[in-house]
């Protein structure tokens, strides 16, 4: 991968000039000038997904200049580097190969000259065998009863991805009850343990090193709770499995290493749901549906790695994001799924994007003088409409939005879905085109009211519009289409990281807080006053000690 400061490229300079021409052009102007705009600025993927990016403040010239930027930053070379197993995560000297985990073509992918696919397939086969034994009831707990509940204990990528996917694919789930514990706050594990029976519960401990503080604290509490009922430590092996690479620590915990599912250092945490970390997904929806999830992602991988930039969906979405973030000064992006099963999708890509591209140092080790990753947030529609859409419509911040919805619902109850989708379509239209003062006044006239007598309220009913959106319409949310959608966003994030010259696949920003927490923890063991920190931290610790009693 080349390390190119994007602001020093000819394309960036051209974009800056182009922005001066575009900054006052409205989306309404663009549609008025081109009645065929939708067909030019939308694309369908695999007859499963329609991406409409026509309601953006862009022209064909904008996209051409953004694609020039991608070329100058050697995006094509970076894509080849990732897919070929080059160690593009240079700060940790690791390859980045989540694409290998879903490589359904089985073409060899090499790391240090060794094809990783045989190992990937071996772990998948092991996950299949294990999950089938649990789901069928063949696997028995220590009292001879079948498993009814699965508790996934992990944090970050070991929790967010599996939780998001099992929720999104709830229509495909079997009889097993799924629970997820992540927070080191004892409330989280306590509340889950109240719901389950030690005789019929399987715990999955998801930690690559088997040393993650939050995960291992929760795992030991789960083990203690289990042994209060089971008594004999030998029973742990029937009720705990590990998603890890530390066989020694797994064995010491009491887990049979035959039930340890490994993954590799070329699997980043926030890209790990495709690996053994996805065992909870397999247990929830079955192995065949998990393979469909992998297949959908693989189809998007092929699209991303082989399609020219001008038709490449992850690249187009990435470039449009850079346009807003760096030229219009938009600091955030909202992800708004109009599907209640997708209620964790925005949270998942909040981590996916912000932990990947929330960096202020470039690949050369220099502090950047441009914007890198945006703030990602969002909630399902229509809930968000009654919460924060006010600011998106009439606030002073530009918030580019991705609206996501399925054409076919899993719950065809009365006319619910038509009402939901009418809101989905209406919101992007309202954001793009707004409502002028003239229209507001005419509405008053149509009601038999004199606008002049209502002058005081008219300005508050005006919508400027010109708020940009993408619309992603899925035929239906299935394991395949969800896999493709997740991969679409993953590759968008990668593309932005390449162009913005940052390392997308490390996360050093999480380390300092952990180091300081490890230093502070021993100081909380007694009641002595602390004076070893700044006055604020000392004051907080000392008040905590006084209040806890």
Swiss-Prot record:
Keywords: Acetylation, Cytoplasm, Gluconeogenesis, Glycolysis, Isomerase. The modification N6-acetyllysine is found at residues 80, 228, 234. GO terms for biological process: gluconeogenesis; glucose 6-phosphate metabolic process; glycolytic process. It comes from the Bacteria. It is an enzyme of class 5 (isomerase). Its EC number is 5.3.1.9. The active site is at 355 (proton donor), 386, 514. One of its GO terms (cellular component) is cytosol. CDD domains: SIS_PGI_1, SIS_PGI_2. Pfam families: PGI (PF00342). One of its GO terms (molecular function) is glucose-6-phosphate isomerase activity. It catalyses: alpha-D-glucose 6-phosphate = beta-D-fructose 6-phosphate. It is found in: Cytoplasm. Pathway: Carbohydrate biosynthesis; gluconeogenesis; Carbohydrate degradation; glycolysis; D-glyceraldehyde 3-phosphate and glycerone phosphate from D-glucose: step 2/4. Belongs to the GPI family. Catalyzes the reversible isomerization of glucose-6-phosphate to fructose-6-phosphate. This is Glucose-6-phosphate isomerase. It comes from Shigella flexneri serotype 5b (strain 8401). The lineage of its organism: Bacteria, Pseudomonadati, Pseudomonadota, Gammaproteobacteria, Enterobacterales. The gene is pgi.
């Amino acid at each position: 991968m080349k390390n190119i400061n994007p602001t020093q490229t000819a394309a960036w300079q051209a974009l800056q000039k182009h922005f001066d021409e575009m900054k006052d052009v409205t989306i309404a102007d663009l549609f008025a000038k081109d009645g065929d705009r939708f067909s030019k600025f939308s694309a369908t993927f695999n007859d499963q997904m329609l991406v409409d990016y026509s309601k953006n403040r862009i022209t064909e010239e904008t996209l051409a200049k953004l694609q020039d930027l991608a070329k100058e930053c050697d995006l094509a070379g970076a894509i080849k580097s990732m897919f070929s197993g080059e160690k593009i995560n240079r700060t940790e000297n690791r390859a980045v190969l989540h694409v290998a985990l879903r490589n359904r073509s089985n073409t060899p992918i090499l790391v240090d000259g060794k094809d990783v696919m045989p190992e990937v397939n071996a772990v998948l086969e092991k996950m299949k065998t294990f999950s089938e034994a649990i789901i069928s009831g063949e696997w028995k707990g220590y009292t001879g009863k079948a498993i009814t509940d699965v508790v996934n204990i992990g944090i970050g990528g070991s929790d967010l991805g599996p939780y998001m996917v099992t929720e999104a694919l709830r229509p495909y789930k079997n009889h097993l009850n799924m629970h997820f514990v992540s927070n080191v706050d004892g409330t989280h594990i306590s509340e889950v343990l109240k719901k389950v029976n030690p005789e019929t519960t399987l715990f999955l401990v998801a930690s690559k090193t088997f040393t993650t503080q939050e995960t291992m604290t929760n795992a030991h509490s789960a083990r203690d709770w289990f042994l209060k009922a089971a008594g004999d430590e030998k029973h742990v092996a029937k009720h705990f499995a590990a998603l890890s690479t530390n066989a020694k620590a797994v064995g010491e915990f009491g887990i049979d290493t035959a039930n340890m599912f490994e993954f590799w250092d070329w699997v980043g945490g926030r890209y790990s749901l495709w690996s053994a970390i996805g065992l909870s997904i397999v247990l929830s929806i079955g192995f065949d549906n998990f393979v469909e999830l992998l297949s959908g992602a693989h189809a998007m991988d092929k699209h991303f790695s082989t399609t020219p930039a001008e038709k490449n969906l992850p690249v187009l979405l990435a470039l449009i994001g850079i346009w807003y973030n760096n030229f219009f000064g938009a600091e955030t992006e909202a992800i708004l799924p109009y599907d209640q099963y997708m209620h964790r999708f925005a949270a998942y890509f909040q981590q996916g994007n912000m932990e990947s591209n929330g960096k202020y140092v470039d690949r050369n080790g220099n502090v950047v003088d441009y914007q890198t990753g945006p703030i990602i947030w969002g909630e399902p529609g229509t809930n968000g409409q009654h919460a924060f859409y006010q600011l998106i419509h009439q606030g002073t911040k530009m918030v580019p939005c991705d609206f996501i919805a399925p054409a076919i619902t899993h719950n065809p109850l009365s006319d619910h879905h038509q009402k939901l989708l009418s809101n989905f379509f209406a919101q992007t239209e309202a954001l793009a085109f707004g409502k002028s003062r003239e229209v507001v006044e005419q509405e008053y006239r149509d009601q038999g009211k004199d606008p002049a007598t209502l002058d005081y309220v008219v300005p508050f009913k005006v919508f400027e519009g010109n708020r940009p959106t993408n619309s992603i319409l899925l035929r239906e949310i299935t394991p395949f289409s969800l896999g493709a959608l997740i991969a679409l966003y993953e590759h968008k994030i990668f593309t932005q990281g390449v162009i913005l010259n940052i390392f997308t696949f490390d996360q050093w920003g999480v380390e300092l807080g952990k180091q300081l927490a490890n230093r502070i923890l021993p100081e909380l063991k007694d009641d002595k006053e602390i004076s070893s920190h700044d006055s604020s931290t000392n004051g907080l610790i000392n008040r905590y000690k006084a209040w806890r009693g």
